Amino acid sequence: MAEGLVLRGTMRAHTDVVTAIATPIDNSDMIVTASRDKSIILWHLTKEDKTYGVPRRRLTGHSHFVQDVVLSSDGQFALSGSWDGELRLWDLNAGTSARRFVGHTKDVLSVAFSIDNRQIVSASRDRTIKLWNTLGECKYTIQDGDAHSDWVSCVRFSPSTPQPTIVSASWDRTVKVWNLTNCKLRNTLAGHSGYVNTVAVSPDGSLCASGGKDGVILLWDLAEGKRLYSLDAGSIIHALCFSPNRYWLCAATESSIKIWDLESKSIVEDLKVDLKTEADAAIGGDTTTKKKVIYCTSLNWSADGSTLFSGYTDGVVRVWGIGRY
């Protein structure tokens, strides 16, 4: 019996591109999404046939596209980054913005929480990476010298604690690995022939995957800073994520969502959206009128690896579940 993914349902409330999806580590019935509609939505997962989740709260305050959102490990707070140049920390219970982080001079493209939630890192079009405490104080700015020479599109903490690490991706075509303790550069990973949109670190912190304009995913050994192999996705890559419990890597590309088994390096799933079927299933069936090409821009697994949440350019979150066939 092979394992595959089937469309379980959709979640509709955003009116523009879904830019990021954050899932809780305790697998509770909630997720948080960010969008170009300038809002962040806290969803309650009903897991019903067609409507997989309903919006419980809409968090507003950013004055431009919200580009990224992550959750604190206790699920009480969300952290967002926006094209308005700010980060915001949100109290999800109160539905209010607890803190604003001001310091970047251009759009904030990516944000991340450290494992202990005490440190926050952000990446911006101003070419810098900033390290903050949770009070909103900028503790360090990585700029000039070893820093990226173009927009910093993505930043992630490595989950392995022995050597706390930040990984960043940039439009300068490189991925950089930094020591968190002193913000010093450990490695520059070069190999992409176009801008890099996204970087993901494997659950054990040993691997890093990067992707972007050239449509090729590069896999790197994080400790050694060496390139291991590449996977051809065939079109621009907007998001990457590792499965938490299978040796799988997912890529959101402009043609489909592709999932690789990293052991065999073969594609196990190629998920495409059938708008006609979806419109027939949806109430009103109005999706067929939209002739725009839609594609996935954000991805995240549930903590138990059974559900893949995917956000699209049409503002819809599509939810895929593991099934056997």
From Swiss-Prot:
Q: Name one GO cellular component term.
A: ribosome
Query: Sorted alphabetically, which InterPro entries does this protein's record hold?
Result: G-protein_beta_WD-40_rep (IPR020472), RACK1-like (IPR045223), WD40/YVTN_repeat-like_dom_sf (IPR015943), WD40_repeat_CS (IPR019775), WD40_repeat_dom_sf (IPR036322), WD40_rpt (IPR001680)
Which Gene3D superfamilies does its entry note? YVTN repeat-like/Quinoprotein amine dehydrogenase
The answer to whether UniProt assigns keyword Metal-binding to this entry is no
**Any keyword Repeat?**
yes
Q: Which Pfam families match?
A: WD40
SMART domains, per database record: WD40 (SM00320)
Q: Where are the WD repeats?
A: 13-44, 61-91, 103-133, 147-179, 191-221, 232-261, 291-321
Q: Which GO terms describe its molecular function?
A: ribosome binding; translation regulator activity
UniProt KW keywords = Repeat, Ribonucleoprotein, Ribosomal protein, WD repeat
Q: Matching PANTHER family, A to Z?
A: RECEPTOR FOR ACTIVATED PROTEIN KINASE C RACK1
Q: Which family does the similarity line name?
A: Belongs to the WD repeat G protein beta family. Ribosomal protein RACK1 subfamily.
Known role: Plays a role in hormone-mediated cell division.
In its UniProt entry, what is this protein called? Small ribosomal subunit protein RACK1
Species whose genome carries this gene: Medicago sativa
